[in-house]
Amino acid sequence: MTLDLDALDRALDALPNLFRGPGGVAGVVKDGQVVASRAWGYADLTRRRPMETATRLPICSISKQFTCGVLLDTLGDTAAYDARVAEFLPQFEGPLPTLRQLCDNQSGLRDYWALTVLQGAEATQTFRREDALPLIARMKTGHFPPGTAYSYCNCNFRIVSEILESETGRALPDLYAERIFGPAGMRTAELTSDTRHPADEVVGYEGSDAVGFFPADNGIFWIGDAGISASLQDMLAYESWIDATRDDENSIYRRISVPPAYVCGTPASYGFGLSHETVAGVKVTGHGGALRGFRAQRFHAADERLSVMVIFNHEASAHAAASSLLAAALGHEAPKGARPEGWAGQWLDPESGLLLRVGEDAEGLTLRFATGPDRLTLGEDGVPRGAGVSLARDGAMLVMNRTSDNLTVRAEPLPVVTVADAGEIAGRYHARELEADLVIEARDGGAYAGFEGLLGEGPMERLHPVGPDVWIVTTRRSMDAPAPGDWTLQVRREGGAVTGLRLGCWLARRIDYARV
């Protein structure tokens, strides 16, 4: 396969303008050799410190594959340690996930960073290492049986890291360095778990080109699920190492990139900290990463021996940027879809309790269900398709097939409500699942929700009606990124009287609150 280097150069030149922000880095590896390496903008605007290819940046959740790689390289068969999962979930009432299901995001556990919102956290407060396990230990149920579906869950990898350190008797930073950083030639990569002290004093920025950029104030401690800082030089060395070991079936990357599957045998889209998807017409493994003020994305196309890496110190889409580089290098043009008609609307999934909203534009559809929006284009057969998702209609119902999640949803139409009296739902509610409270206040047409729990009393969040007895709670900033976004809140009644609520987002579904 021959790269279109001219097109790749043009795509690289376009990144600072297309994905506007303080700075970024991007690089490409082909056949084990670095063919492009760029750094632009500033690692700190105020101090005028330029971004460089040697500047270490948080790679965030890309760290998950390193955790899984070390796990396989040190402990081997994960099944031998399945019994240890119970130690971290002492109140869990259903079947427990296996260690492999944790690594594959098939545990069914709710994401602990999403739950920090419901436990009363404020986005910038300190979250210590010792704060995580008590929060996880409160879990009593999951949102699906282990091994049957996919849901992104950071605490899966926190549990994995705790087991890994306990079984080896060694600290995770040392294991990363011995098993991956050293062999791969990642000379400056290290685990920087405390986000208050970023490597090389790099500054991440919230905001946008429309409103301006301001330094992100992060205070979380993460390990196993994220936490590695690495320069572009380090990450390109990692990609070269992957290529150099491609023919060794016992190499770490070969082992973590085996095709995953669900317990029913259906192929899965995520395994051992790697996403399996098709980008620019080719199969890739990779992962994204996010922390407030930072975004990262890597892709590796094994058959093409091609890798792409992008990191921003702002919140533009690194996934879109990396995809554009892959498409340029391969000469891939995405097919244009027909203009959709009659798809716009909103529906409610009775199983998950989540809202589905579909918007139309000239180029396709925007589906809002998971943490981020899905873009779908209309094929010649009239079926809207996106990455791992398609839509169909069955009368008034909307059928969403998320092959990437092993999930089919038959959602019922939800009439639009834009004005509702929140007075009857105002009050205090308690969630047994979380051992935490929700307070709703209503005044002069406005409604707000506040969460109280293990981590304190969080800020009041906006509450907006969207349908009969259905509201959304809007969370735009949280400890981790991206934030949960819109939570769907359903009102539960008995004899017309409000008795409770059901709250959920894609990361944390079906949480019941009883009126106090």
Swiss-Prot record:
Enzyme category, top tier: hydrolase
Record-linked Pfam families: Beta-lactamase, DAP_B
Active site: S61, K64
Keyword Secreted: no
Activity regulation (record text): Inhibited by beta-lactam compounds such as 6-aminopenicillic acid, 7-aminocephalosporanic acid, benzylpenicillin and ampicillin. Inhibited by p-chloromercuribenzoate.
UniProt KW Protease keyword: yes
One Gene Ontology term from the biological process aspect of the record: proteolysis
EC number(s) recorded for this UniProt protein: 3.4.11.19
Keywords recorded for this protein, A-Z: Aminopeptidase, Hydrolase, Protease
Binding-site residues, substrate: D480
Residue ranges, annotated region (Important for specificity): 476-486
Catalysed reactions, semicolon-separated: Release of an N-terminal D-amino acid from a peptide, Xaa-|-Yaa-, in which Xaa is preferably D-Ala, D-Ser or D-Thr. D-amino acid amides and methyl esters also are hydrolyzed, as is glycine amide
MF terms in GO: aminopeptidase activity
Function: Hydrolyzes N-terminal residues in D-amino acid-containing peptides.
PANTHER family found in the cross-reference section: BETA-LACTAMASE-RELATED DOMAIN-CONTAINING PROTEIN, D-ALANYL-D-ALANINE-CARBOXYPEPTIDASE/ENDOPEPTIDASE AMPH
Subunit details: Homodimer.
HAMAP family, per database record: D_aminopeptidase
Family recorded in the similarity comment: Belongs to the peptidase S12 family.
Protein name (Swiss-Prot/TrEMBL): D-aminopeptidase
Organism per entry: Cereibacter sphaeroides (strain KD131 / KCTC 12085)
Highest classification ranks of the organism: Bacteria, Pseudomonadati, Pseudomonadota, Alphaproteobacteria, Rhodobacterales
